[in-house]
Amino acid sequence: MATYSNQHWLLSHIRNSFISTDDTGMCETVMLSDDMPKHYLRKFGNSGAGGDHYHWRRAHKTPPTGGGTTPERNTRHPDAPLQEVDFICYPGLDLSDDEEDMSTHSFDIQMYPEVGAHRFRSNTAQKLEKLDIAKRRAARIKSVNYQEEVQPPESDDFFKRKELPLSKAERVKNEPKANDDDLSDEGVQSQLTEQLAKSPKQAQNRFIEFARFDGTSQVGMQTKRINVFLNMLPEPDRNYPLKICVVATAKIQEVIGFVCYRTSLQYPDVPLKSLQHYALYMTEDNDDMEDFPPLDNREPCSKFGFSQLTLAERRPLAPVTRVDYHSQLGSKSMTSVEDKTALSDAAVKALQNISLNGGTSDPGGGGGGGDSPHDNVKEYEKRLLNHNDMLEAPMHRTFRLNIIDKRFFKSDVTLGISGERIEIDQCKNAKFWPQKKPVSTPIDFVAHCEILERRHLKALLRIWLKSNSSSPSFSTGCTSAPINASVTTLNAGSGSGGIAHSPSSPGHSSGLFSSSNIRFKHYDFDTDTHTAEQIHNKLNCILEMRSSDLRREFLLQRDRKQEKRQLKL
């Protein structure tokens, strides 16, 4: 562009180049503004203060024409006035904006894109082209995984055999024996035998299974900190609590086991009994147990907000004295002197039978010294379990199991047992047979519950009831024929865990059991062994506590049938 001498053409080309290549639009705004040289000329036209023009005048000033020998010193020549010719203006500013005027446009830019127009690429197109070039370069590159083969060191350099001097036992062993018959090696023992003889005997901790409830080793689980006073420790150690941290989901029984585990580690000399002997009691700050019952073993420890508890042996439970009135009246007043005397005598007799160790004294005077302490512990544990079962038996509880009808079809039912009645409600299913109505039977009409058969994981449960004149909806599981030797066979003794007949065997009872004026029917259920045992224990415990005439009559008739069967054999 330096070869061009047309200043107007150069300015137009520069102006249009900047405007066409600037994406921001700022260049076009500046260059299309007013003509600055004209404004400058109008403002300083007559003042003569143009700085650029002044320097241009000094650089091109003419030499003096005078012939004098003395040069002019400090002579100030007035500057010529500024002219419009001294400024180079943008061309085309004073012209019209007519599109047909070609002098206002650049000579290299076409106004119509159809005719030889060049469109600038966007940033996206440039990036796509760069990615395409990078992919082409990557296609020509081959990746090779370099794996250096590591030579394993020789094991002989690390494991050198060390020559040890022979011990006394080996020297005695290597010495030739004088007599070939002398083969005894008395006095020679290995180091392991010597260490085992010197080390104390370490028995396995029987409470080790409760160590998993330690809350100090758990991450992301809720824990609970409790201060437990140990009542079995001596007096100096009893006043300071044992601080434990257990998981919040641990039950009271598991907390007791964990406390026993910590006690066995911290106080190994203190003898501990089984978990059935201990209970957690509410306590005060001064280690005084309150006169409240212990915490329920089945409840989680997070349910109770106590921070201090006491682990002590269970307090002896007084036996429950019950007076039965065999009369036809539903209730009887206790205002008579005879009734009060009988009740007081029964209470005094029950209190006299209680001994200090929680057991019952022998009224005959026989000494109980022949029983070992281990037998007494087992008997005490059994009484505790029986007492807990008696307390839990009247509570309402539901079980999910299958009922078997006379066609050996199984239906899912819900069995509800409480101290007042039993309820059988069929679960909703999408099978083709219709829905049966629920059955509710008072507990007074229930005679017996037994387990007929025990398999690997299943058990067959039977519940005997008193038959009504109108058979209920579930009566399809039993027939209504009177009992005789050829129709039914009562499997006596099957509830004690013996082998009984299955419903498909010939010895299975499919009829009713009746005596003089009482007719019995039964329901057969198929469930797992654990659920069957829970139902058997719960229902029989309720029946034993009530001791109804119906149950006694049923057991009497069953014993008679068993005796007749044994006589026939």
Swiss-Prot record:
Q: Does the keyword Phosphoprotein apply?
A: yes
Residue ranges annotated as compositionally biased, kind Polar residues, are 187-200
* Cellular component, GO annotation: cytoplasm; plasma membrane; TORC2 complex
> Which residues are recorded with the post-translational modification Phosphoserine?
S333, S355, S372, S504
Residues in SIN1-type PH domain copies:
395-545
Q: Name one GO biological process term.
A: stress granule assembly
Every CRIM domain range: 189-314
- Mind listing the UniProt keywords for this protein, alphabetically? Apoptosis, Phosphoprotein
Compositionally biased region (Basic and acidic residues) = 169-180
Subunit annotation: Component of the target of rapamycin complex 2 (TORC2).
Q: What is this protein called?
A: Stress-activated map kinase-interacting protein 1
